[in-house]
Design a protein with these regions (language model features):
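A conserved acidic, glycine/proline-rich C-terminal tail/linker
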Residues: 211-247
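Hydrophobic, well-ordered secondary-structure scaffolds
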Residues: 228, 252-253
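Catalytic-core "active-site belt" of small-molecule-metabolizing enzymes
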Residues: 2-210, 245-247, 251, 259-267
Length: 267
């Protein structure tokens, strides 16, 4: 980055926060390193905390090798979750608050214990999970629509908080099991040309395996920023099904089998 690193990071973070607030998060094409991108994300976190937003957890993104290839990275990324972007099942949201709304159906966990850098075995991670929750993650999809065609967009993705725009959570279930999981995602868009529901069915061990893999990766990665996952935090663990761009108005429903369901409306 040109100029004073501190000035450049702060100025860039201010601009990206303004883009987030105005729902104009798009792919800018700026050339940052991964380290610079995470520095910008940390400054964004400081700014959001200063205006009263509370950190409630983290998200892991780019868990799929396909998405990693599209954005030009060979590992996942992480973003932060804030109390201002958490809603409960059944909520109706204004689609205008998202820059090209897109959704993912996935599993999240709520932690009942802190995790340190050595706490990455399956058994330790499972003991730290208080509950498993089906969620609908909301994204600024306009960014990804361009990023996945240009490639090498990972640093901009990281700096923009992994284009996370909030999440809707279901009730979930206590604990965690590695038993084969299920996610059925349906989107109903009354004004879409087809006007037929879109469905994605994902069934298999990878649905639950990604939870532990993502949590282990996050626990190690956060050490670089002197952070760690803490009891009480929510961790979005990455989606096995692909991200779905949606048109508004629409109804989104995710069925996670024994773990319950979650639904929302975008108006």
């Amino acid at each position: 980055m040109e100029g004073s690193p501190i000035t450049s990071v702060a100025a860039t973070a201010r601009r990206l926060l303004a883009d987030f607030d105005s729902a104009s998060v798009t792919e800018s094409g700026e050339a940052w390193s991964e380290a610079e991108a995470y520095a910008i994300a940390s400054e964004l976190d400081r700014m959001r905390a200063a205006r009263g937003e509370r950190l409630v957890g983290f998200k892991v993104g780019c868990t799929s090798p396909t998405i990693q290839k599209q954005v030009g990275i060979d590992n996942p990324v992480f973003g932060r979750l804030y109390d201002t972007g958490v809603w409960h099942t059944g909520v109706s949201l204004n689609g205008g608050r998202f820059s090209g709304p897109a959704i993912e159906g996935e599993l999240a966990v709520k932690l009942c214990a802190d995790l340190g850098i050595d706490d990455t075995s399956d058994d330790t991670l499972m003991r730290a999970i208080g509950s498993t929750i089906p969620v609908i993650e909301l994204h600024h999809g306009a960014f990804m629509a361009t990023a996945t065609t240009t490639g090498h967009a990972a640093p901009r993705l990281i700096a923009n908080n992994a284009v996370h725009a909030g999440f809707v959570e279901g009730a979930g279930k206590s604990g965690f099991s590695l038993a084969s999981g299920k996610l059925t995602i349906s989107v109903v868009e009354p004004e879409h040309e087809a006007a037929e529901p879109r469905f994605i069915d994902a069934v298999g061990p990878e649905i639950t395996r990604v939870v532990l893999d993502s949590l282990a990766w996050l626990t190690k990665r956060l050490q670089h920023d002197n952070l760690r996952p803490l009891a009480g935090q929510t961790i979005l663990c990455g989606s096995v099904p692909p991200m779905l761009p949606v048109t508004t108005p629409c109804e989104v429903h995710v069925d996670a089998g024994d773990l319950g369901t979650v639904a929302c409306s975008l108006l």
